[in-house]
């Protein structure tokens, strides 16, 4: 059987009891290592789980899934995913391939950023579509997130923005030459995300959000050093030092925000007076 095991958001102890039982009995244990990261290293996981772990990069999962699924019709294979197993479509694809091979699949869920983000103080049912922000290049500045934020904002909903992770990526030159040389890992920060959002608004000029739109920067959600910083998008452009190391994400507030949410989030504000002023003018009582 193929088990998809969620590992939670932070460290080795976030795995569920059921998930740990699966990992301990499985013939092989894989760790998906490119859609997100835990805040501890592979050796720490192996020590806690009492099992060797094979790191599965994007190439293995997307191009060599037969190795992961090898003999899974006869033995148990654990495919471990940071957060919840179905936070990325790649894992749906792995399940579909397993089904084609007649392999049974079972999921062991866990907390993900989609649920853990509630710690920022906003009600989860007031979130709209989640969007992703990738690193801009000189000749590539994808802005599909903008229209989704526009839809969310039109009905007063918050937007969770998930930030880019570059792990085991190749430069165009190395890719073209077929060289297995990889760039150092890169993790987008809230500051970069906020700046890129404002650049796209400057281009679009549709007033979906602006420098004084309220937002929350989130760092290491679910971990011991979890951190939230709230302020305007302009303020968050310079908030990386306050937030600290990765992983980061960002929430753009919608106008359907309750007073209790305001009071909760206000405690994270870079400038409480500025936060109160904008809240009263643009958010309080608005839909």
UniProtKB/Swiss-Prot annotation:
Q: Where in the cell is it found?
A: Cytoplasm
Alphabetic keyword roster: Cytoplasm, Methyltransferase, S-adenosyl-L-methionine, Transferase
CDD domains per UniProt? DHP5_DphB (cd11647)
Enumerate the InterPro entries for this protein.
4pyrrol_Mease (IPR000878), 4pyrrol_Methylase_sf (IPR035996), 4pyrrole_Mease_sub1 (IPR014777), 4pyrrole_Mease_sub2 (IPR014776), Dphthn_synthase (IPR004551)
- From the UniProt record, give the pathway where this protein acts: Protein modification; peptidyl-diphthamide biosynthesis
Q: Which Pfam families match?
A: TP_methylase (PF00590)
One example of the protein's molecular function in GO is: diphthine methyl ester synthase activity
Annotated Gene Ontology cellular component terms = cytoplasm
Q: Which family does it belong to?
A: Belongs to the diphthine synthase family.
The entry's function note states: S-adenosyl-L-methionine-dependent methyltransferase that catalyzes four methylations of the modified target histidine residue in translation elongation factor 2 (EF-2), to form an intermediate called diphthine methyl ester. The four successive methylation reactions represent the second step of diphthamide biosynthesis.
Q: What name is this protein filed under?
A: Diphthine methyl ester synthase
**What is the source species?**
Neurospora crassa (strain ATCC 24698 / 74-OR23-1A / CBS 708.71 / DSM 1257 / FGSC 987)
């Amino acid at each position: 059987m193929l088990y998809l095991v969620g590992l939670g958001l932070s460290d080795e102890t976030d795995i569920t009891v059921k998930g740990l039982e699966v990992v301990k009995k499985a013939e092989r244990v894989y760790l998906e290592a490119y859609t997100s990261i835990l805040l501890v290293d592979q050796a720490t996981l192996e020590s806690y789980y009492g099992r060797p772990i094979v790191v599965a990069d994007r190439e293995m999962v997307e191009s060599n899934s037969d190795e992961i699924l090898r003999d899974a019709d006869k033995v148990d294979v654990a495919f471990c995913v940071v957060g919840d197993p179905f936070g990325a479509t790649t894992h749906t694809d792995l399940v579909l391939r397993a089904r084609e091979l007649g392999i049974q699949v079972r999921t062991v869920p866990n907390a993900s950023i989609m649920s853990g983000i509630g710690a920022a103080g906003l009600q989860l049912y007031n979130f709209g579509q989640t969007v992703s922000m990738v690193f801009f290049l000189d000749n590539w500045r994808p802005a599909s997130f903008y229209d989704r934020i526009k839809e969310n904002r039109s009905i007063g909903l918050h937007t969770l923005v998930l930030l880019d992770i570059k792990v085991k990526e190749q430069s165009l030159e190395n890719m073209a030459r077929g060289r297995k040389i990889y760039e150092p890992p890169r993790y987008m920060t809230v500051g970069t995300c906020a700046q890129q959002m404002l650049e796209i608004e400057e281009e679009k000029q549709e007033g979906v959000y602006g420098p004084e739109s309220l937002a929350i920067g989130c760092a290491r959600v679910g971990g011991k050093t979890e951190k939230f910083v709230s302020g305007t998008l302009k303020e968050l452009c310079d908030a990386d030092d306050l937030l600290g190391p990765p992983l980061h994400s960002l929430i753009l507030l919608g106008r359907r925000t309750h007073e209790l949410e305001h009071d909760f989030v206000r405690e994270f504000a870079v400038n409480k007076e500025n936060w109160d002023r904008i809240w009263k003018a643009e958010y309080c009582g608005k839909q």
